[in-house]
């Protein structure tokens, strides 16, 4: 079985499923998509750790272009453990938090939560898996976007203001 693509699954799958949650707008279906994304990410990162027992590093060059020219994902022992850790935490959060989500958010906004959660997770996984600084910055921005949305979804009227304040602070820090 060809498993060269394993390093990209925890990044690409949540990133690909996030727009579906936004388009479908069904809370239960979005929850199911999120559980599937987190479960597959957790399983693939576990198998990646298994492959790392025989290798020092797993790499995946996008489009066949090597690292200095193209985009390359690289998983070594440390970021393999980190990827498995955040995938496991993401799966646990998805399974456990869904019960209390109805008290924290209006039902009509649940799909926003799952979209933002998937974006945040994909950004974190991308920062861990990427092998170049440019894509690390891109994934930090994706994760930040998801985090701003999660903060803005709060019931409190100050949530939107807090999200905007966090965004401005982050922009100043990046600059």
What function would you assign to each model-found segment?
Residues 11, 73-74, 87, 120, ...:
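Short conserved micro-motifs on helix faces and helix-strand junctions that flank
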Residues 16, 20, 96-100, 142-151:
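Juxtamembrane interface elements at the cytosolic ends of transmembrane helices
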Residues 112-119, 123-170:
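Alpha-helical multi-pass transmembrane bundles of energy-transducing inner-membrane proteins
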Residues 13, 37-40, 89, 140-144:
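Transmembrane alpha-helical core residues of multi-pass small-molecule transporters
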Residues 1-6, 20-115:
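Transmembrane helix-loop-helix hairpins at membrane boundaries of multipass inner-membrane proteins
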Residues 15-21, 64-70, 120-134:
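Membrane-embedded alpha-helical segments in integral membrane proteins
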Residues 171-175:
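Short "domain-exit" segments at the C-terminal end of structured domains
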Residues 5-17:
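The first (N-terminal) embedded transmembrane alpha-helix
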């Amino acid at each position: 079985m060809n498993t060269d693509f394993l390093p990209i699954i925890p990044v690409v799958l949540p990133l690909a499923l996030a727009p579906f949650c936004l388009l479908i707008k069904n809370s239960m279906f979005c929850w199911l998509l999120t559980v599937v994304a987190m479960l597959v990410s957790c399983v693939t990162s576990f198998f990646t750790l298994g492959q790392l027992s025989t290798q020092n590093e797993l790499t995946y060059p996008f489009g066949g272009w090597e690292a200095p020219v193209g985009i390359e994902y690289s998983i070594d022992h440390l970021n393999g453990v980190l990827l498995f850790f955040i995938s496991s935490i993401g799966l646990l959060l998805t399974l456990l938090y869904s019960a209390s989500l109805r008290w924290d958010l209006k039902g009509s906004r649940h799909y926003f939560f799952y979209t933002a959660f998937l974006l945040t997770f994909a950004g974190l996984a991308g920062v861990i898996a990427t092998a170049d600084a440019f894509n690390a910055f891109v994934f930090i921005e994706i994760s930040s976007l998801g985090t701003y949305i999660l903060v803005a979804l709060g019931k409190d009227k100050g949530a939107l203001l807090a999200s905007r304040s966090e965004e401005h602070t982050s922009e100043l820090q990046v600059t």
